[in-house]
C-alpha cells in the first residue's frame, strides 16, 4: 500500500467541498442521526495511514471515526471517495482531519474542537545531519518537495536545492535510498513509513513548528450539522482524547500524537 496521501487528501477535500456546495444547505439534526442509528464519514479507500478499505488496517481516520461513532452510540457508515466518483453523489456527515483554519472550509461545514496537530515536517536520510528549522537548511542540500507546494516556496528561500516529487511515497523512498538528503513531508507519512520500513528508517524533525504556514490543527468537519450534533461530537472528541484512545490509534500507525 502506498502513501500517496497529501495529494489524495487534497482531492478528498476538493470533492467534499464541491459536494457540499452542490447539495441543498439544510441541517442534519443530531436527532436524525440518532434515529437512523448511524453517522457517515467520507474517506479515501487507498490512503494509508489515513484511510483504507482493508479491514485489518483501516487507517487512523477510520479508527478515530469509529471510536467517535461509538461514543455517540451509533454505527459508522463509510462513504468511499475516489477521483472518478461524482462528488455530488457523496452524502456523508463527517470528514476527519479537516484543517481548522479560518476561511478554508465552506460555510456549510462546521468544525469540532481540534484533536491533532498536523503540518509538513522535515525528514532526513539515514546518516544525514539534521536541522531544527527550514531556515537552517544548508545551501546545496538536496530537499525533496511536493511540486508547487507551500513547503517548496519556503525551501526555495533557504538556498537548498529542491527536488520536486508528485507523491510522498516516492519522496520517502528516494530519501531512504539517499537520492535526496531531506524531504518536506507530513509527519503522519514519515511515521508510517518508519513503522513499515524498520530496516531503513528516516529521521523526523518537526521543523513545521517554526513555520506557521506549514503547521495547523485538524478537527472533525461536520456537514450541515446542528448545534446539538456539534456539542455531542465535541464531548466525544474530548473523551477520546482524555482516555488515550486517539493517542493509541495514532501509535498503531507509527504517528506521533501532538495534542493541540
State the predicted function of each range.
Residues 1-5:
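N-terminal secretory signal peptides that target proteins for export/translocation
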Residues 25-99, 103, 107:
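Extracytoplasmic small-molecule ligand-binding "clamshell" domains
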Residues 40-48, 55-72, 99-102, 121-171, ...:
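Bilobed "Venus flytrap"/periplasmic-binding protein-like clamshell domains
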Residues 44-45, 116-124, 195-238, 254-260:
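Periplasmic-binding protein-like
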Residues 59-71, 128, 135, 141, ...:
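Extended ligand-binding regions for polar small-molecule ligands
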Residues 68, 87-91, 137, 175-176, ...:
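Hydrophobic residues within well-ordered alpha-helices
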Residues 85-89, 99-107, 154-157, 181-214:
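A ligand-binding cleft/hinge motif common to bilobed small-molecule-binding domains
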Amino acid at each position: 500500500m502506498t502513501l500517496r496521501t497529501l495529494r489524495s487528501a487534497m482531492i478528498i477535500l476538493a470533492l467534499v467541498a464541491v459536494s457540499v456546495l452542490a447539495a441543498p444547505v439544510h441541517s442534519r439534526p443530531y436527532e436524525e442521526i440518532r434515529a437512523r442509528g448511524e453517522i457517515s464519514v467520507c474517506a479515501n479507500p487507498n490512503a494509508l495511514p489515513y484511510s483504507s478499505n482493508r479491514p485489518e488496517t483501516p487507517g487512523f481516520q477510520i479508527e478515530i471515526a469509529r471510536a467517535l461513532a461509538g461514543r455517540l452510540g451509533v454505527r459508522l457508515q463509510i462513504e468511499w471517495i475516489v477521483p472518478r466518483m461524482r462528488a455530488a453523489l457523496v452524502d456523508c456527515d463527517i470528514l476527519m482531519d479537516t484543517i481548522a483554519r479560518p476561511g478554508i472550509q465552506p460555510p456549510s461545514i462546521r468544525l469540532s474542537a481540534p484533536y491533532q496537530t498536523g503540518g509538513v515536517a522535515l525528514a532526513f536520510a539515514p546518516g544525514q545531519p539534521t536541522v531544527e528549522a527550514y531556515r537552517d537548511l544548508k545551501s546545496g542540500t538536496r530537499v525533496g518537495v511536493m511540486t508547487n507546494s507551500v513547503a517548496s516556496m519556503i525551501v526555495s528561500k533557504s538556498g537548498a536545492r529542491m527536488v520536486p516529487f508528485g507523491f510522498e511515497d516516492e519522496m520517502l523512498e528516494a530519501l531512504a535510498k539517499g537520492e535526496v538528503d531531506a524531504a518536506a513531508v507530513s509527519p503522519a507519512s514519515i511515521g508510517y513509513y518508519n513503522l513499515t520500513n524498520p530496516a531503513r528508517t528516516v529521521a523526523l524533525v518537526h521543523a513545521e513548528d517554526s513555520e506557521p504556514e506549514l503547521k495547523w490543527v485538524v478537527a472533525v468537519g461536520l456537514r450541515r450539522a446542528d448545534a446539538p450534533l456539534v456539542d455531542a461530537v465535541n464531548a466525544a472528541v474530548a473523551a477520546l482524547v482524555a482516555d488515550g484512545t486517539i493517542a493509541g490509534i495514532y501509535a498503531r500507525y507509527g504517528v506521533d500524537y501532538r495534542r493541540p
